[in-house]
Amino acid sequence: EERLEDLYADKYKLFIEQPIDHTNPSLGTFKQKVILFHVDYINPMLLVTEGYTSNGEHPRYSNELSTLFETNMIEVEHRYFGESVPFMQDDSTITDETLNWDYMTAKNEAADLHRINQLFKKIYSGKWIATGISKGGQTTMFYTTYYPEDIDISIPYVGPLCKGQEDGRHEPFLAEFAGTPQDRKILYNFQVEFLKRREAIRPMFEELSARNNLTYKIPMDAVYDYCVLEFPFAF
């Protein structure tokens, strides 16, 4: 464990040993990163179910539910993200392309959270709240579906249940319903101009990436296209 300094009086970075596959312990284990924010052993516990990499180490990290209800908080990094990637922890030669992704399942992620819940319930006696945002909201829903007795209340912030890798519902919604017709026209014109002026704008885009130490696993042109095409969704 590692003690961290920030908004909370007591904050710790922990690694919880988890089965790679909760239905087949013989496959071995990996270490899952967990950030514990301690207030008091009798206060409620907020379990933040991340959908991706943990952000809890940031010195200003907080959560509005934790503030509203004066809770302790556990932020759990999702398996296969950040420092919580099975197999890679033991073999530095493994890449995203060669990694075995078979155990990245809703059941396993829910079982990870269940195990963490059971461990910390031995210490904290208050009520438990589960929450997450976006894919973290999905994680909250999956977790409380598989283990409803773990949690007293779940509050997912946005919980998109996608039909597949390409859902198909977002594009017509953004094109026809989101915002006002004037808003949609302004955003469309903005996108067209950025694509037309790619050669002039791209150097500024590259400079911004370098200044913020941003690196990408795909070509810069593809990153540029993603930023332009997804701007209405982010807006």
Residue ranges and their predicted role:
Residues 1-72:
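Catalytic-loop region of hydrolases
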Residues 10, 63-69, 122, 143-152:
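Short, surface-exposed basic-aromatic patches at helix termini and helix-loop junctions that form
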Residues 27, 57-62, 84-88, 97, ...:
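Short, solvent-exposed loop/turn and secondary-structure capping segments
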Residues 100-123:
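Alpha/beta-hydrolase active-site loop
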Residues 124-134:
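Alpha/beta-hydrolase fold nucleophile elbow
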Residues 133, 142-235:
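Alpha/beta-hydrolase
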